[in-house]
Amino acid sequence: YTFVPVVLIVSMFTFSDRVERQVTGPKTGADRQVTVEVYGKQWAWDFNYTDENVHVTGVQAHLDGSPGKEAELPTLYLPVNSNVDVVLKSRDVIHSFWVPAFLEKRDTIPGMTNHIHITTKEIGDYKGKCAELCGEYHSEMLFNVKVVSQEDYDNYINSLKQNPENQGIAGDQYNRNPNQNATPRPANQ
């Protein structure tokens, strides 16, 4: 009475684990591999372009009664036809990186690193948000994703390299001052 159920459970686990690894594992077949480190923080997103040694820090949301401006949202730029390893981390509480068009959502958990592997197949603009209730300004924790041509991506990265504020990789440091870009600027590496 126990042998058959145990065999069924073990076989279902084995097949489920194999399928999950195929779905969530690194993708193949694109022209280029890109790694982007994404930090969730109350209440904004920071993007490290680790291959390029530059970063973008999001300004923390602080509601003042006026509508937010989409132009001020942090934007993650990705080149088209690339395999992207999105490395997810959190500076404070659990957040959830979600771009509905990518059909995948993953939590950012303090002290833990998660990954999302995506392949960028078409140029376009996409909306992203935190999908985990993370505090009083959670609803303002929005970001944009722009999938652009390789030339536009290179131009964007070069513009970041020209600005000393964006040089280096933003690490785990965090200062929770509202309505300020309070993440300390990293030392150039």
Describe each model-derived feature in a short phrase:
Residues Y1-Q189:
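Non-transmembrane, membrane-proximal soluble domains of secreted or membrane proteins
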